[in-house]
Amino acid sequence: MRDIIFDNFQNSVNDSLLRHRNILDILSKYQESQARASRAVCKAVTNCGCIKVSAEKQDLIYDENYLENLNTITSGIEGQLCDNCREVIERELGNNMFYLASLCNALGLNLYDIYLKEYL
């Protein structure tokens, strides 16, 4: 079922992309969409304040308790996204996924196959 969702998404991107079919256009739009997604996260911190970044060096000890030690690693994010920031970030990440699928289409790659190779 998941492969159908991925394939349908990738096919709909291919069908709806009227401009920017050139690989250089796709790469620049993909990079721009990533920057916009990153900027939206930064705005959630600096403009809205619904989340806070509190990051520091995290020491990971590779010993027999390695898996337990992974639970001590934090994301460095405090708080929860407000509804507005969540909506903006979701929209920007969706746009980023659109151009990722477009890049896969241009290169003849299947997004679901890539997901499986990375996941498994």
Each model region followed by its residue ranges:
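Flexible "arm" and connector segments at domain edges
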Residues: M1-L93, M97-L120
